[in-house]
Every structure is written in C-alpha cells, then in structure tokens.
Amino acid sequence: MINNIRQDAEVRMEKCLETFKNNISKLRTGRANPNLLDNIKVDYYGSIMPLRQLANIIVEDTRTLVITLFDQSIIKRVEKAIIISDLGLTPDLSGTIIRVQLPSLTEERRRNLIKIVRNEAEQGKISVRNIRRDANDHIKILLKNKAISIDEERRSQSEIQKITEAWIRRLDQILSEKERELIDF
C-alpha cells in the first residue's frame, strides 16, 4: 500500500516537472527553437490547425527558423498567423519557404522572462508540495485505519519528504539553467 502511494506521488511529481519544462520551452530566449511556434494556429480550409501539422519547422541558425509548408497555397495565411501572434516575430517569405528571424532580447524583456520562468517554477513547486500533502494524507488514513504502525507512518512520511525535496531540486536546477540561458543570450 505504502509503495503504491509513493509510486503514485513520484509519477505525479514527474508530470509536474514535465509540464514545467514544456511551459518554459515555449518562452523565446533569443535562440531559435521550433517549439516557439507551437501555439500558432492557421485557418486551413475552414479548420483551425496547429502550424506544426501544416509545415516542417527547422532551425537554420541560432536566430532563424525555416518553415516549409506541405501545402504552398496557404503561405499567406501562415504569414498572417505568425504576424498576429503575440510573439513579436516577423516572417519573411522566400519563395516556397518562410524564414522567421528572432529579434535579440532587450534587457527589460529578459527580466520579464526571468520573472515568468520563476513564477512557472514556483507553480511547479506548489504542485509538488500538494502531491506530498496528498500522499501524507493517504498515509495518515492508513494509520487511522490501523493498516500501518506509527513507525511505518513516520518512515513513509520521511521517504515522501525526501522524494519531494529531490523533485524540487530538479525544478530548481532546470530553473537556473533557463535563467542562465536568458541572461547569456
């Protein structure tokens, strides 16, 4: 029973970490990354489709993305979708491909992005702590139902605490890497 509670907590904490990584990977750091365009949707013959499903997006250099559309007839719609997105990107049509140059980040924008990343990290930590609380509550229920002893309860809660601290350290490590990336570019 206790192993199931611990494993469930670890799986849920790992999902929190993956969500955090996914959220911060979409932030523009000055370095080209195809994930920047994940939220761009394009009108494709009456259906709203993600750009990623309509094109191949590759990194040409550190500050340029190249978009090669599967259907060239929608090139203007894709250009418009990129322009109206709130990413501050300007597409450049070059025949059958679209190049997107990433402008360099201003100091103010860097500080703003660091605040956003720190906030995302804090939300991740809160989620991890909530998972710890849920696991501890389940352990207390087992104690109340006399399924485990007081010693087992304390040992289990100590284990859960160590697991929580490990996942929070991982979150902090990813946070510091992202902050360094934002400062360096």
From Swiss-Prot:
Keywords: Cytoplasm, Protein biosynthesis
Annotated GO MF terms: ribosomal large subunit binding
GO CC terms, sorted: cytosol
One biological process term in Gene Ontology: cytoplasmic translational termination
Keyword set includes Cytoplasm: yes
TM region positions: none
Pfam families found in the cross-reference section: RRF
Cross-referenced InterPro entries: Ribosome_recyc_fac, Ribosome_recyc_fac_dom, RRF_sf
SUPFAM superfamilies: Ribosome recycling factor, RRF
Top-level taxonomic group: Bacteria
Family matches, as HAMAP family: RRF
Name this protein carries in UniProt: Ribosome-recycling factor
Origin species: Baumannia cicadellinicola subsp. Homalodisca coagulata
Gene that this polypeptide is encoded by: frr
